[in-house]
């Protein structure tokens, strides 16, 4: 039956495996009378018994590798059949954890349950998933919980394997009552239960503390996060908008009391905001293994180019609750940023990409970034931003230096000062 399933490709691999097995046996016990082989045999015979056993072990390891590759191809589980290979979407480890996440993820802030319809949300998730994205991020506060409801409904409707997804949510603002907000043990446990009900999931892969809470002792926060992980409600936990000192304190408390430390920090990162991700988080990564999941690669749409001639009516900055964004755009600093974006346009044209694609690829060129969360309100925007994957190989050191010379905002680490 197994032979029947292999087909022509399986037979060929089986033949290669058989040949390699014969070669291994031949080299281990037979003699070749050709001058070249004879000299090699003399050389082999001069090896000590331990040396010969090491050679034999290497041959057997190679044989096992060939047979394993043959079996994986037979089961369509080889590297050529993985989602990363077939879609071209690179995957990276989340910090120093073993969790593999697509280097681009889809966020739901503002869009799901607010700026877009449920139908558009489904279309966006479908495009992302079929493009190799496995990371979907939300929060209990997004659209007062509606974003989680929409995200969970789409996952259930699509029938995607839960094991193929990385779902993350964030806790802090759960309701109007004092006990429904913050990072108390009560709200972390009850808030996550509420999120799981809205998502229609048994667990999330990562639960984030959406901001620091000065009213709750760090030990209580870490104990509560450890508890929800031990209860199977989450796989990992992380922080969002925490300072490096606060993250380090959480790690120290976790190690002191044999609890689970955070694996990731969610931080804003784009062409005009760099210091935390480029200076502070790399130190934390090397010291305690905390990775970076970044958001707002287009600076809430500022880098998209849509605000070059003012604020369009359909844009995010035109919404009542985003007057702060409008003020930022029309400010003196905002006008300077728009001028810098115009100077970056020739670089994008030379690389054959759009300015948003250049901006996202610029974020990805930082190997310390585990994943960049995209926020799109239309399928066209999402497809354009996903195209940054093709631009990433073009982000050479020369191109990065060109961008730095225009931005003139590169932060300096302690290492730079020492050098």
UniProtKB/Swiss-Prot annotation:
Residues 1-51 are annotated as: Disordered. It is found in: Cytoplasm; Membrane; Cell membrane. Its main location: cytoplasm. Keywords: Cell membrane, Cytoplasm, Ion transport, Membrane, NADP, Oxidoreductase, Potassium, Potassium transport, Transport. SUPFAM superfamilies: NAD(P)-linked oxidoreductase (SSF51430). Residues 30-43 have a biased composition (Basic and acidic residues). The keyword Coiled coil does not apply. The keyword tRNA-binding does not apply. The N-terminal domain of the beta subunit mediates closure of delayed rectifier potassium channels by physically obstructing the pore. Belongs to the shaker potassium channel beta subunit family. This is Voltage-gated potassium channel subunit beta-1. It comes from Oryctolagus cuniculus (Rabbit). The gene is KCNAB1.
């Amino acid at each position: 039956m197994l032979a029947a399933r292999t087909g022509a490709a399986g037979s060929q691999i089986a033949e290669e495996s058989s040949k390699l097995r014969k070669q291994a046996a031949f080299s281990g016990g037979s003699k070749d009378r050709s001058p070249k082989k004879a000299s090699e045999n003399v050389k082999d015979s001069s090896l000590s018994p331990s040396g010969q056993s090491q050679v034999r072990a290497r041959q057997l390891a190679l044989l096992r590798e060939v047979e394993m590759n043959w079996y994986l191809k037979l089961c369509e589980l080889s590297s050529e059949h993985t989602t990363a290979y077939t879609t071209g979407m690179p995957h990276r480890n989340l910090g120093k954890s073993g969790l593999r996440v697509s280097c681009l993820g889809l966020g739901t802030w503002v869009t799901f349950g607010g700026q877009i319809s449920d139908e558009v949300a489904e279309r966006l998730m479908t495009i992302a998933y079929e493009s190799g994205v496995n990371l979907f991020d939300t929060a209990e506060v997004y659209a007062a919980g509606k974003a989680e409801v929409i995200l969970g409904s789409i996952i259930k409707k699509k029938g995607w394997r839960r094991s193929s997804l990385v779902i993350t949510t964030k806790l802090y603002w759960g309701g109007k009552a004092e006990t429904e907000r913050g990072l108390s043990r009560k709200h972390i446990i009850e808030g996550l239960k509420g999120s799981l009900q809205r998502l229609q999931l048994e667990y999330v892969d990562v639960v984030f503390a959406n901001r620091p809470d000065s009213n709750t002792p760090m030990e209580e926060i870490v104990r509560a996060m450890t508890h929800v992980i031990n209860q199977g409600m989450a796989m990992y936990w992380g922080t969002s908008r925490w300072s490096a000192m606060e993250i380090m304190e959480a790690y120290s408390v976790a190690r002191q009391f044999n609890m689970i430390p955070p694996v990731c920090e969610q931080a804003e990162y784009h062409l005009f905001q760099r210091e935390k991700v480029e200076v502070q988080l790399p130190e934390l990564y090397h010291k305690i293994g905390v990775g970076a999941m970044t958001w707002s690669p287009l600076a809430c749409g500022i880098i998209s180019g849509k605000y070059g001639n003012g604020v369009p009516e359909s844009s995010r900055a035109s919404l009542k609750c985003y007057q702060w964004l409008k003020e930022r755009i029309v400010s003196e600093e905002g006008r300077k940023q728009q001028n810098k974006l115009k100077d970056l346009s020739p670089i994008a044209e030379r690389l054959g990409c759009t300015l948003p694609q250049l901006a996202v690829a610029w974020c990805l060129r930082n190997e310390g970034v585990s994943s960049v969360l995209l926020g799109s309100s239309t399928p066209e925007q999402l497809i354009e931003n996903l195209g940054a994957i093709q631009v990433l190989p073009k982000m050479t050191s020369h191109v990065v230096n060109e961008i730095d010379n225009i931005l003139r905002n590169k932060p300096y680490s302690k290492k730079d000062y020492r050098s």
